[in-house]
Each structure stands twice: as C-alpha cells, then as structure tokens.
UniProtKB/Swiss-Prot annotation:
Molecular function via GO: hydrolase activity, acting on carbon-nitrogen (but not peptide) bonds, in linear amides
Gene encoding the protein: rutB
Any GO BP annotation: uracil catabolic process
Catalytic residues, chain numbering: 23, 132, 165
UniProt keyword list: Hydrolase
Originating species: Agrobacterium fabrum (strain C58 / ATCC 33970) (Agrobacterium tumefaciens (strain C58))
Name of the protein in its database record: Ureidoacrylate amidohydrolase RutB
C-alpha cells in the first residue's frame, strides 16, 4: 500500500508494518495525571485519544501489529536513576514529586493509576507491550528484537508527547534503519503549539515521513482483512 505522506508517499507492506502507541497513559493524557499536575496543557489529549483509537481499529482489522510503549519506573524509582543520572534532573515527573513530596510514589510508578494505559486504548489480544524507563522506546528495551523477529521494517508512530518520547523513539528507529511515519493528528505535544510544528518539521525533513490519520486509515482499509 502507498501512504500519502510528506515529503513524499511511502510504500508500506502491512505484514512489515507496526503501529507504535507511545505512552498513552493516564500520566500524559488525563486530568490529575502527572503531566496535568506538572502544569502542562492536556486539553488536546481527548482528540488525540479518539484519533489513536480510529488508527488502531483500522490497523488491527488489517492485521497490522500494534505495539505499546509504557513509560515509568519501579515504585522506589531505582530505575529512574539517582542524582548521577541526567534523567533524575530533567524528568518533570521526578521534579514534580520533589516539589510536592505528598505525590511521591504516585507518578509513573508501575502498578499505579498514573502508569496505566488509558481506558479508551487498552491493549487487545495480539498487541505487544514494551515497558521503557527513558524517553526512547529503544533504549534498554527489547523493542529492536521484537521488530526483527517479526520482519517489521516500518513503524507508524502515534501518542504523547510529540516532542519528547515520540520524537526520541522515531529518531532512534531511524538510526536503527527503520522507516518511521508520524501521524501528526494522532500525537500531542507538551509545550507551546510551535513545538508540535517543530517536531513535524524535523520528522518530515530529516528522520521520516508525516501523514494523517484519515490517510492512514483510508489506505490500510484497502489491505486484505484479517480472517480467523
């Protein structure tokens, strides 16, 4: 199938393609989650969730593999790194808990509501879940092995945040020789609106391809349907 994309169309074989859902957790998209508590605007997250659901429904119907990234750490935050790690200094979740000690153990800790995937996008049978502890879903995970074992070469990225974990993962995919596509209306940024456009520009010009949910769903719906 040929996907209309920028800067040029890209051909994707469904059996060699996966949709990668980046960090669609309560932490990043729900009122009362870490991102909301840290002061970021999450008002666009509801629309993002709806567009991701549309994407996943179409992908599963066509037999395209769905892979979830889930970001966070153990309840004691050992995996987050201590003061010797730049993550300790830059993670807004960790900084928020240091400012508000009453939140300690609640933000991005495995097993908590904050860490959980949002109700609307719960993984389905056959989907793959890849836990991660840093922005990129390729760092210290089995993601590369998961993809190579299945002959997957093309990755369609959706999720939050466009300019952090989505872009970090797509860049690493590029460096590992994967073809990365970002569905711009199925991602949401953290920060001013121009941040979204900056990532779109980076992906389009340097690291991959940019497309829309409607274009992806329109093309993938023409693939042979999955039969039992």
């Amino acid at each position: 199938m040929t996907l209309p994309a920028r800067p040029e169309p890209i051909t994707l074989k469904p059996s060699e393609t996966a949709v990668v859902v980046v960090d669609m957790q309560n932490a990043y998209s729900t009122e009362g989650g870490y991102v909301d508590l840290a002061g970021f605007d999450i008002s666009g997250a509801k629309g993002t969730i709806a567009n991701i659901k549309k994407t996943l429904d179409a992908a599963r119907a066509a037999g395209v593999q769905v892979i979830y990234f889930q970001n966070g750490w153990d309840k004691d935050y050992v995996e987050a790194g201590g003061p010797g790690s730049p993550n300790w200094h830059k993670s807004n979740a960790l900084k928020t808990m240091r400012k508000r000690p009453e939140l300690q153990g609640q933000l991005l800790a495995k097993g908590t509501w904050d860490y959980a995937i949002v109700d609307e996008l719960q993984p389905q049978p056959g989907d793959i879940l890849v836990p991660k502890t840093r922005y990129s879903g390729f760092f210290n995970t089995n993601m590369d092995s998961v993809l190579r074992a299945r002959g997957i070469r093309n990755l369609v990225f959706v999720g939050i945040a466009t300019n952090v974990c989505v872009e970090s993962s797509l860049r690493d995919a590029f460096h590992l020789e994967y073809f990365g596509v970002m569905l711009e209306d199925a991602t949401h940024h953290l920060g001013p609106d121009f941040i979204q456009q900056a990532t779109v520009y980076n992906v389009e010009k340097f690291f991959g391809w940019v497309a829309t949910v409607n274009d992806f769903c329109g093309v993938i719906s023409q693939a042979a349907p999955v039969t039992d």
